[in-house]
């Protein structure tokens, strides 16, 4: 088992990155090692809890030979603008065939186990017994989008914030309802909004119409219906954090551009001109 290499600076750990192999919860996944990328911003050595970001990557032209670093480089997991102590985890998915990946090991509570494992490894590295989760953020790009919806349906710790970057393709009509999963998002959205404004959350969907437009627009309708029942002053604030938006960027660039801004503030306004 590899050790996380942390660099203390005064009373904090400086920002860093590590790659771990043979992650227990990910053992059923086919693909290369290492299978887990962990990143963190500045974290106080006395911290009892941290925010956690889990990022589900999409397909790869390299198929089963894809190195995890390929996805880390374009993930947008840049926390330099984030003030809260945060640990990000990017698990390698399960290679199916051709370019396709999914995340079956994160179903049935697997994401909870992944988060617990990552925090345990980090806590051990700083000489702590445990670290608790404060806020949980789930982000997904491309082929990671629909698996993220499935993960939410089977987790004991639903995310406070959900960011999906051109990933809501819907289901193959040959296997059933192409809009299956909307009911999960609607349930999560209702539960999430019930916690506002005391515990703020977000749902940001960035999409390209010809690729993920139909499902994404249905999510937009769910948001509109839910916010219609909210007191107007609060609804105005929520609309900045719960919304869908058309991307003016090429598919592969969306997460790398948008996620750093959303990790800084979930109500971020994107300047597509730059």
Language-model segments: residues:
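A domain-start/cap signature at the N-terminus of enzymes
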Residues: 1-52, 86, 229-240
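Active-site machinery of serine-nucleophile hydrolases
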Residues: 47-122
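Loop/turn elements at helix/coil->beta-strand transitions in domains of secreted/extracellular proteins
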Residues: 48-52, 83-88, 132-135, 156-161, ...
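Solvent-exposed loop/turn segments at secondary-structure junctions
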Residues: 58-62, 93-98, 142-146, 167-171, ...
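Alpha/beta-hydrolase fold nucleophile elbow
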Residues: 129-142
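Short glycine-enriched nucleophile-adjacent loop
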Residues: 145-156
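Catalytic active-site module of serine/aspartate enzymes centered on a nucleophile-bearing elbow/loop
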Residues: 255-274
């Amino acid at each position: 088992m590899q050790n996380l290499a942390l660099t203390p600076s005064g009373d904090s750990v400086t920002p860093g990155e590590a790659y771990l192999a043979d992650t227990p919860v990910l053992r059923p996944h086919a693909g290369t090692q290492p299978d887990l990328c962990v990143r963190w911003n500045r974290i106080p050595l006395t911290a009892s809890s941290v925010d956690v970001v889990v990022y589900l990557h999409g397909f790869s032209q390299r198929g089963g030979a894809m190195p995890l670093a390929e996805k880390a480089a374009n993930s947008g997991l840049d926390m330099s603008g984030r003030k809260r102590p945060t640990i990000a985890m990017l698990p390698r998915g399960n290679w199916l065939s051709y370019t396709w990946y999914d995340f079956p090991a994160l179903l049935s509570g697997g994401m909870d186990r992944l988060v617990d494992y990552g925090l345990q490894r980090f806590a051990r590295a700083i000489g702590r017994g445990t670290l608790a989760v404060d806020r949980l953020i789930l982000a997904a790009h491309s082929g990671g989008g629909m698996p993220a919806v499935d993960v939410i349906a089977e987790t004991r710790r639903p995310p406070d914030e959900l960011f999906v970057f051109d990933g809501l393709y819907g289901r193959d009509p040959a296997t059933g309802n192409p809009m299956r999963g909307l009911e999960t998002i609607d349930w999560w959205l209702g539960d999430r909004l019930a916690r506002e404004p005391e515990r703020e959350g977000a749902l940001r969907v960035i999409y390209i119409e010809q690729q993920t437009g139909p499902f994404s627009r249905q999510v937009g309708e769910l948001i509109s219906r839910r916010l219609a029942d909210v007191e107007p002053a609060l609804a105005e604030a929520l609309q900045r954090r719960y919304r869908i938006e058309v991307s003016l960027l090429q598919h592969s660039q969306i997460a790398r551009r948008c996620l750093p801004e959303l990790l800084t503030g979930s109500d971020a306004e994107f300047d597509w001109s730059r």
